[in-house]
Amino acid sequence: MKCKNYIFTLLVAFATLLSWWVVPSLVKKATDDSHSYPLMYYSSMLKELCIIDFRGGNETFSDAKGNVYPRSEYDSLLPLLNSRVLMMNGVMPDTIDGCAIEPKQLRVKQVSFRYRPSDMVAPQPQMGVLFEAMPKRGNLTMPGDFFRMEDDCITFVDAKTNTVDEKKSDRFTREMKKKGFAFPARAFWGNPTTRKPYEEGYFCLDANGQLFQLKMVNDRPFVKNTHVSDSVGVKWFVMNEAMDKRHYGFVFGTKGEAGILEENDGDYRFVKMDIRSFNPAEDELMVLGNILYWTVNVQNEKGLDSYGLNRETLERLSSYHIDAKKGLWDKTSEWLFPCYLSFTSPQSGY
């Protein structure tokens, strides 16, 4: 009898826990509305952030000060966003803010970048691909081997034979240690694809928190300490090969910093974006840059913060905040499900 009561208690407990997960999950799928926001873009003509929302048949757009403009002025007030249309119609300005407008420069100076929290919490590859940075025929090609970071060395493995290339591994390990790299590496970030304009290798965070650049030039190791860790504690890095080679990628710091790792006459420099404190575990980041200005959007479950930045200094010129609208799930879950189980993070999906 006691055994039956024990089993019955376990079944009730299991059913209760299961209902705390299944029922809320089904209700959330049926009622949850994903938070969507209008497109934000800094206008080089208005010198202000513009709110562009043509959803639902809306034919107007406005700026951050509340001024509303007709749809017919959309292209002319945002010439750097709609340059193709204006050039096709022959009405693109020759200069904006004293800067000559040339199609090639517009393309080269364009920056498009997006980061999501899932990028950081997703399983990271344990092996990397180091391309030749100065290929003889100009095109990036697969090197035929992969590397992995060990406790006290870097190891290159031949892709065909699955054997370790002892000479190459020793050559790169000795050079890394010579330049001050402390094993084991905490993390390493790169862009292992041939579909990129050029090769800058990998950026590796060593055991002391120093960020190093590692690449292969003429089949020889190139290792250099960026020293950006002297000014910012590196929490995460994302490679982003800019067309104009201005920066190597985006750096997220341990104290909420977000900015770019910039090329600086053969050295490196961290340029912080003048935005609110950024948490890569919770916040999304989108950057739309042109020849004069950057529009930076930071989004989380609380809302959207948008910034217009000077391209050269990344200093703030304008800012705007939009609160997240509560959907049906947000309104009902507070009282319908005061507590429930979830096996995924709302920020990352993992």
Language-model features and meaning:
Residues 36-42, 72-112, 116-117, 124-143, ...:
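Repeated scaffold domains used in trafficking and secretory/extracellular systems
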Residues 6-25:
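Hydrophobic membrane-insertion alpha-helices, especially the h-region
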Residues 151-166, 209-215, 255-268, 299-319:
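Structural motif
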Residues 205, 294-341:
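Extended, hydrophilic extramembrane loops/domains of integral membrane proteins
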Residues 50-51, 145-149, 201-207, 247-260, ...:
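Short beta-strand motif characteristic of blades in beta-propeller domains
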Residues 42-71:
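Short extracytoplasmic
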Residues 164-177, 222-230, 262-263, 268-278, ...:
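Beta-propeller fold detector
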Residues 22-50:
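Alpha-helical transmembrane signal-anchor/signal-peptide segments
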